[in-house]
Protein backbone atom coordinates (compact mmCIF):
# COMPACT_ATOMS: atom_id res chain seq x y z
CA UNK A 1 0.00 0.00 0.00
CA UNK A 2 1.05 3.65 -0.34
CA UNK A 3 4.31 4.38 -2.17
CA UNK A 4 6.00 1.10 -3.07
CA UNK A 5 9.81 1.28 -3.31
CA UNK A 6 10.95 -1.04 -6.10
CA UNK A 7 14.53 -2.16 -5.49
CA UNK A 8 16.69 -3.95 -8.02
CA UNK A 9 19.57 -3.86 -10.49
CA UNK A 10 19.82 -2.44 -14.00
CA UNK A 11 23.45 -2.49 -15.18
CA UNK A 12 25.68 -3.66 -18.01
CA UNK A 13 29.24 -3.05 -19.20
CA UNK A 14 27.66 -1.23 -22.15
CA UNK A 15 24.51 -0.05 -20.37
CA UNK A 16 22.11 2.18 -22.28
CA UNK A 17 18.84 2.50 -20.30
CA UNK A 18 16.14 0.79 -18.30
CA UNK A 19 12.35 1.04 -18.17
CA UNK A 20 10.13 -0.10 -15.31
CA UNK A 21 6.48 -0.71 -16.19
CA UNK A 22 3.27 -1.78 -14.47
CA UNK A 23 -0.10 -3.15 -15.56
CA UNK A 24 -3.24 -4.46 -13.86
CA UNK A 25 -3.50 -8.25 -14.03
CA UNK A 26 -1.24 -11.29 -13.89
CA UNK A 27 -1.22 -12.04 -17.64
CA UNK A 28 -1.35 -8.71 -19.50
CA UNK A 29 -1.20 -8.09 -23.22
CA UNK A 30 1.91 -6.39 -24.59
CA UNK A 31 0.19 -3.08 -25.34
CA UNK A 32 -1.23 -2.67 -21.83
CA UNK A 33 2.03 -1.88 -19.99
CA UNK A 34 2.33 1.60 -18.45
CA UNK A 35 5.70 3.19 -17.54
CA UNK A 36 6.56 4.08 -13.96
CA UNK A 37 8.32 7.48 -14.22
CA UNK A 38 9.63 6.83 -17.75
CA UNK A 39 12.99 5.68 -19.16
CA UNK A 40 16.19 6.11 -17.10
CA UNK A 41 19.70 6.33 -18.54
CA UNK A 42 21.36 5.90 -15.12
CA UNK A 43 22.45 2.38 -14.11
CA UNK A 44 21.30 1.03 -10.74
CA UNK A 45 22.98 -1.65 -8.64
CA UNK A 46 20.91 -3.15 -5.80
CA UNK A 47 19.17 0.14 -5.13
CA UNK A 48 15.86 1.90 -5.74
CA UNK A 49 14.69 1.69 -9.33
CA UNK A 50 11.43 3.58 -8.97
CA UNK A 51 8.69 4.56 -6.50
CA UNK A 52 5.26 3.18 -7.48
CA UNK A 53 2.40 5.35 -6.16
CA UNK A 54 -0.06 2.52 -5.55
CA UNK A 55 -2.77 4.88 -4.28
CA UNK A 56 -3.23 6.13 -7.86
CA UNK A 57 -4.49 2.73 -9.06
CA UNK A 58 -7.27 0.39 -8.01
CA UNK A 59 -6.69 -2.51 -5.62
CA UNK A 60 -5.88 -5.83 -7.24
CA UNK A 61 -3.17 -7.97 -8.82
CA UNK A 62 -0.52 -6.10 -10.81
CA UNK A 63 2.44 -7.11 -12.93
CA UNK A 64 5.77 -5.27 -12.85
CA UNK A 65 8.26 -5.46 -15.71
CA UNK A 66 11.87 -4.26 -15.78
CA UNK A 67 13.51 -3.97 -19.21
CA UNK A 68 17.26 -3.22 -19.34
CA UNK A 69 18.78 -2.29 -22.72
CA UNK A 70 22.46 -2.15 -23.69
CA UNK A 71 24.24 -0.11 -26.40
CA UNK A 72 23.68 -2.73 -29.13
CA UNK A 73 19.94 -3.04 -28.42
CA UNK A 74 19.97 -6.27 -26.43
CA UNK A 75 17.19 -6.38 -23.81
CA UNK A 76 16.89 -8.33 -20.57
CA UNK A 77 13.40 -8.52 -19.06
CA UNK A 78 12.37 -9.42 -15.50
CA UNK A 79 8.76 -9.65 -14.27
CA UNK A 80 7.11 -9.76 -10.87
CA UNK A 81 3.48 -10.06 -9.73
CA UNK A 82 2.23 -8.12 -6.70
CA UNK A 83 -1.08 -7.48 -4.96
CA UNK A 84 -2.04 -3.87 -4.21
CA UNK A 85 -4.36 -3.36 -1.25
CA UNK A 86 -5.05 0.17 -0.03
CA UNK A 87 -8.43 -0.69 1.52
CA UNK A 88 -8.34 -1.21 5.31
CA UNK A 89 -10.28 -4.07 6.93
CA UNK A 90 -13.96 -3.42 7.65
CA UNK A 91 -14.93 -4.18 11.25
CA UNK A 92 -18.49 -4.53 12.60
CA UNK A 93 -19.15 -5.43 16.25
CA UNK A 94 -22.74 -6.60 16.70
CA UNK A 95 -22.66 -7.80 20.30
CA UNK A 96 -22.16 -6.80 23.05
CA UNK A 97 -23.57 -3.34 22.39
CA UNK A 98 -22.23 -0.10 23.88
CA UNK A 99 -22.68 -0.04 27.70
CA UNK A 100 -24.37 -3.47 27.71
CA UNK A 101 -24.37 -5.29 31.07
CA UNK A 102 -22.77 -8.74 30.71
CA UNK A 103 -21.85 -11.67 32.94
CA UNK A 104 -20.11 -15.05 32.93
CA UNK A 105 -19.16 -16.13 29.35
CA UNK A 106 -19.84 -13.40 26.79
CA UNK A 107 -20.13 -14.16 23.08
CA UNK A 108 -18.42 -11.44 21.04
CA UNK A 109 -20.32 -11.31 17.75
CA UNK A 110 -19.36 -9.42 14.61
CA UNK A 111 -17.92 -9.43 11.11
CA UNK A 112 -14.42 -8.56 9.92
CA UNK A 113 -13.75 -8.58 6.18
CA UNK A 114 -10.82 -7.68 3.93
CA UNK A 115 -9.41 -8.99 0.67
CA UNK A 116 -6.08 -9.77 2.37
CA UNK A 117 -7.06 -10.13 6.02
CA UNK A 118 -4.22 -11.46 8.16
CA UNK A 119 -5.67 -11.62 11.67
CA UNK A 120 -8.26 -10.30 14.12
CA UNK A 121 -7.31 -9.73 17.76
CA UNK A 122 -9.74 -9.19 20.63
CA UNK A 123 -8.56 -7.41 23.81
CA UNK A 124 -10.10 -6.17 27.05
CA UNK A 125 -9.07 -3.97 29.94
CA UNK A 126 -10.52 -2.28 32.99
CA UNK A 127 -7.58 0.11 33.22
CA UNK A 128 -3.93 0.02 32.20
CA UNK A 129 -2.66 -2.48 29.66
CA UNK A 130 -4.82 -4.43 27.24
CA UNK A 131 -5.20 -8.17 27.88
CA UNK A 132 -5.77 -10.65 25.06
CA UNK A 133 -9.01 -12.59 24.65
CA UNK A 134 -8.14 -14.35 21.39
CA UNK A 135 -6.46 -14.09 17.98
CA UNK A 136 -8.27 -15.34 14.87
CA UNK A 137 -6.68 -15.78 11.45
CA UNK A 138 -8.48 -16.00 8.11
CA UNK A 139 -9.66 -14.16 5.00
CA UNK A 140 -13.05 -13.29 6.53
CA UNK A 141 -14.10 -13.69 10.16
CA UNK A 142 -17.81 -13.60 10.98
CA UNK A 143 -20.45 -14.42 13.59
CA UNK A 144 -18.79 -15.51 16.88
CA UNK A 145 -15.42 -13.79 16.95
CA UNK A 146 -14.55 -14.86 20.50
CA UNK A 147 -15.85 -16.02 23.87
CA UNK A 148 -14.85 -13.78 26.77
CA UNK A 149 -14.86 -15.40 30.21
CA UNK A 150 -15.69 -12.71 32.78
CA UNK A 151 -16.45 -15.06 35.70
CA UNK A 152 -13.24 -14.20 37.58
CA UNK A 153 -13.30 -10.48 36.82
CA UNK A 154 -14.36 -7.84 39.30
CA UNK A 155 -17.66 -6.16 38.57
CA UNK A 156 -17.39 -2.83 36.81
CA UNK A 157 -16.81 -1.03 33.54
CA UNK A 158 -14.51 -2.61 30.94
CA UNK A 159 -13.37 -1.82 27.42
CA UNK A 160 -13.35 -4.31 24.56
CA UNK A 161 -11.15 -3.70 21.52
CA UNK A 162 -11.09 -5.40 18.11
CA UNK A 163 -7.95 -4.99 15.99
CA UNK A 164 -8.02 -6.17 12.36
CA UNK A 165 -4.74 -6.37 10.42
CA UNK A 166 -4.28 -7.09 6.73
CA UNK A 167 -1.17 -8.23 4.90
CA UNK A 168 -0.45 -4.98 3.06
CA UNK A 169 1.34 -3.21 5.91
CA UNK A 170 -1.16 -0.39 6.36
CA UNK A 171 -2.33 0.66 9.85
CA UNK A 172 -4.79 -1.80 11.44
CA UNK A 173 -8.49 -1.05 11.85
CA UNK A 174 -9.53 -0.73 15.51
CA UNK A 175 -12.95 -0.64 17.18
CA UNK A 176 -13.44 -0.05 20.92
CA UNK A 177 -16.58 -0.59 22.99
CA UNK A 178 -17.48 -0.14 26.67
CA UNK A 179 -19.33 -2.90 28.56
CA UNK A 180 -20.28 -3.42 32.20
CA UNK A 181 -19.46 -6.71 33.92
CA UNK A 182 -21.91 -7.80 36.63
CA UNK A 183 -21.38 -11.27 38.10
CA UNK A 184 -22.93 -10.46 41.50
CA UNK A 185 -26.31 -12.11 42.10
CA UNK A 186 -29.22 -9.91 43.23
CA UNK A 187 -29.98 -9.81 46.97
CA UNK A 188 -33.30 -11.30 48.09
CA UNK A 189 -34.69 -11.50 51.64
CA UNK A 190 -38.05 -11.87 53.38
CA UNK A 191 -37.57 -10.38 56.83
CA UNK A 192 -41.07 -11.15 58.08
CA UNK A 193 -42.77 -13.50 58.52
CA UNK A 194 -40.07 -15.98 59.46
CA UNK A 195 -39.87 -19.42 57.90
CA UNK A 196 -42.55 -21.79 59.26
CA UNK A 197 -44.28 -19.00 61.20
CA UNK A 198 -47.97 -19.59 61.85
CA UNK A 199 -49.94 -16.60 60.73
CA UNK A 200 -53.61 -15.72 60.67
CA UNK A 201 -56.19 -13.09 61.49
CA UNK A 202 -56.07 -11.75 65.02
CA UNK A 203 -59.50 -12.11 66.79
CA UNK A 204 -60.23 -9.89 69.79
CA UNK A 205 -62.92 -11.14 72.24
CA UNK A 206 -64.72 -8.80 74.63
Q: Whereabouts are the PLM-identified features?
A:
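Surface-exposed, short loops/turns at beta-strand junctions within beta-sandwich domains
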Residues: 55-60, 151-156
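Aromatic/hydrophobic beta-strand junction motif of beta-rich domains
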Residues: 6-10, 108-112, 205-206
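Flexible, low-complexity linkers/stalks enriched in Thr/Pro that connect modular domains
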Residues: 53, 70, 80-92, 149, ...
Amino acid sequence: SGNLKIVGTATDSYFDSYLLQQVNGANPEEGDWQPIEGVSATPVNSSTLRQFATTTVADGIYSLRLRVTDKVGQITTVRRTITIDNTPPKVTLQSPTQNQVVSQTVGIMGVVSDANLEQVQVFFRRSGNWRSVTTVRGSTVSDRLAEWDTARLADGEYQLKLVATDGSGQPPTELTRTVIVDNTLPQAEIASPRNDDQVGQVVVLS
